[in-house]
């Protein structure tokens, strides 16, 4: 563990080492006059009295390779800073959830043909175990409006941190399951949200955000100790069960289900890619709405894809390929999502990549 006192000691040692450099140190060893060099006896090149001692030019030193911090568990990497960072060119920015790039390669389709149905059956069997229906029932200080505000704030936060849609879905699942079993005070509700985001990122992402990043986004209203302690509490309350099926998984499954045929054309692949992109934006809107808390992720995925197909005027409806749900239940969920989209048209267009112009999507269709 690196403490403040240890850091001060290291800084003092570093300063002493720089002062005792090779250009200024004195010879401490005793030598005979015969061992002295002409430079030591002053017999070297004649010195000009008008010219002072020539000093070496100082150049800024940079590391050839940047230090990569690997220990990011529970923010351990926040304790260590790179002593001399090297100038690195900024990485190109990408649109969040930009799925308009080709996402259905031959290897992925073949893997889906081999294992897709087994993965779907397994995740479908886990839905009810991870579904937190009426999670605010025993929350006297947390209302549906507060939950909506928190998740609406987490959406741009997770985009700012370049996290995937899977992380956001898992964050909301962890948040709702914790609210279902533990009363939460209103003044620490935001801390519960960012802690859920940290746990979900560790479960899904290869480079989860740092603790100090999350605390800075909260305007440093909470301490590092509070966040780490709450992280342990959430994990204990959920019994470390974090592998919840998400809307994102079922969106990918149903989309791949459309293009598994050998006769799938490039047009069908393009339409499917656009549909799943719009469906993710619709699903993001639904995550913040407490009215969809009782619907399973697989049902939400089917309904979001149906609304997306309708908005994009596609002729390949997803419902014809899915027969696991009652028609009345699908109609009920689709009706609520249709109302949600019609009331949040501007928000939906802001959530979608820039390729989707407003004119290309018929929200009122």
From Swiss-Prot:
Disulfide bond sites: none
Descriptive protein name: Cyclin-O protein B
Sorted UniProt keywords: Cell cycle, Cell division, Cilium biogenesis/degradation, Cyclin, Cytoplasm
Cellular component annotations (GO), alphabetically ordered: cyclin-dependent protein kinase holoenzyme complex; cytoplasm; microtubule organizing center; nucleus
Membrane-spanning segments: none
Pfam families named in the record: Cyclin_C (PF02984), Cyclin_N (PF00134)
Protein task: Specifically required for generation of multiciliated cells, possibly by promoting a cell cycle state compatible with centriole amplification and maturation. Acts downstream of mcidas to promote mother centriole amplification and maturation in preparation for apical docking.
Major localization class: cytoplasm
Ranges where the record places region Disordered: 22-64
Entry's Gene Ontology BP terms: cell division; cilium assembly; G1/S transition of mitotic cell cycle; multi-ciliated epithelial cell differentiation
Gene Ontology molecular function, alphabetical: cyclin-dependent protein serine/threonine kinase regulator activity
UniProt record similarity statement: Belongs to the cyclin family.
Subcellular location: Cytoplasm
Native source organism of the sequence: Xenopus laevis (African clawed frog)
Biased amino acid composition, Basic residues: 53-64
């Amino acid at each position: 563990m690196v403490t403040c006192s240890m850091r001060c000691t290291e800084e003092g040692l570093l300063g002493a080492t720089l002062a005792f450099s090779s250009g200024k140190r004195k010879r401490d060893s005793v030598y005979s006059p015969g061992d002295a060099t002409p430079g030591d006896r002053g017999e070297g090149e004649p010195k000009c009295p008008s010219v002072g001692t020539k000093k070496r030019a100082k150049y800024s030193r940079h590391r050839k390779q940047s230090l990569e911090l690997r220990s990011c568990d529970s923010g351990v990497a926040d304790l260590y800073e790179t002593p001399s960072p090297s100038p690195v060119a900024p990485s190109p920015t990408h649109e969040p959830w930009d799925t308009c790039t080709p996402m259905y390669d031959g290897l992925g389709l073949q893997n889906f043909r081999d294992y897709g149905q087994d993965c779907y059956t397994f995740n479908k069997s886990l839905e009810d175990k991870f579904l937190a229906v009426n999670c605010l029932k025993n929350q006297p200080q947390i209302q549906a409006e507060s939950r909506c505000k928190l998740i609406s704030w987490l959406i741009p936060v997770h985009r700012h941190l370049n996290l995937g849609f899977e992380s956001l879905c898992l964050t909301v699942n962890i948040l709702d399951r914790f609210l279902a079993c533990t009363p939460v005070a209103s003044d620490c509700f935001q801390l519960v949200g960012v802690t859920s985001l940290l746990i979900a990122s560790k479960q899904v992402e290869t480079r989860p955000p740092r603790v100090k990043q999350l605390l800075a986004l909260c305007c440093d209203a909470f301490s590092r100790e509070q966040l780490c302690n709450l992280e342990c509490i959430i994990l204990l309350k959920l019994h470390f069960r974090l592998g919840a099926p998400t809307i994102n998984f079922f969106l990918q499954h149903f989309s791949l289900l459309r293009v598994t045929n050998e006769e799938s054309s490039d047009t069908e692949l393009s339409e499917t890619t656009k549909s799943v992109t719009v469906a993710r934006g619709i699903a993001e809107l639904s995550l913040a709405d407490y009215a969809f808390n009782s619907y399973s992720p697989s049902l939400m995925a089917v309904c979001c894809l149906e609304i997306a197909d309708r908005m994009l005027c596609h002729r390949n409806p997803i419902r014809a390929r899915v027969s696991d749900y009652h028609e009345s239940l699908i109609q009920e969920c689709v009706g609520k999502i249709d109302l949600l989209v019609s009331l949040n048209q501007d928000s939906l267009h802001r959530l979608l990549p820039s390729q989707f112009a407003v004119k290309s999507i018929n929200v009122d269709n």
